[in-house]
C-alpha cells in the first residue's frame, strides 16, 4: 500500500512531488497565526489526569496544571500512552502495538555519501551496506529537495553506516519514526474505537504511513469525531 500510495510502482506518469517553502515550520506558523485564543509552546507534560468533567494536563516541576474540557494527544502512540495516568484497557491494548525506532540524522556537506556519478544524484539516494544487506541508509540532497539557493551541496543522511567527514558535519539529531509491522497495521483500524473516550482524542502520523501528511489527515478525521 505504501509503494502504491506514493506511485513507486509506476515507471511513467509518476506523481509530481512538492516541498513546502521553508519546510514544516511554515504550516505550523500558519496554523498558530489563525488561533484566536491562547496557546502555549514547549511545555514538558508530566501526566494527564481525566475525569467525567474534563482533563488536567500537568507540567513542570511544581505540579502545575492546565484544566480543559478535552485533550488531543497529537504525539507518538507510545508517548501518548505514557502521558495518560489512567489508560483504559483498550488504550493500552491498541497503542502498545505501535513501535518506534530511533534514527540518527546527520546534516553535512560530504559528497562521498552520494553516488559517484553526479548524473545519478536525486532527492532521495539509498545505500546498502555491502557487509550487511539488512543495514541501509538514505541520503537526501537538500539543495534539490528544498530548493536551497546556495552553492554548496548540503545533505541529510539517515542512519549512515559509512564514515562522514567530521569537518563537514553541521548537526546530528536523534529522533524516532514509526516502525510498521503486522500488529501496527492491524491496529490502525481500531484507533477510532478509542477516540473521544474519557475526554481524550488521538492524532498522529501512526494513523497512516508516518508522514506529516498522515498526521494532518488524522487530525482532520479526529475533528469530525470531536464535533459529533
Task: For the regions a language model picked out, list residue spans one by one.
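Active-site/ligand-binding neighborhood in enzyme catalytic cores
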Residues: 1-48
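Aromatic-acidic/polar surface patches that form glycan- and anion
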Residues: 17-24, 64, 73, 208-215
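Active-site catalytic microenvironments for nucleophilic, acid-base chemistry
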Residues: 34, 86, 225
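Short, well-ordered alpha-helix to beta-strand connector turns
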Residues: 35-36, 68-69, 197
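A structural signal for the hydrophobic beta-strands that form the central parallel beta-sheet
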Residues: 39-41, 73, 202
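Conserved beta-strand termini and adjacent loop/short-helix elements that scaffold enzyme active sites
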Residues: 42-44, 60, 203
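Mid-domain catalytic core of redox enzymes
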Residues: 46-178
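C-terminal catalytic lobe of FAD-dependent flavoproteins
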Residues: 164-228
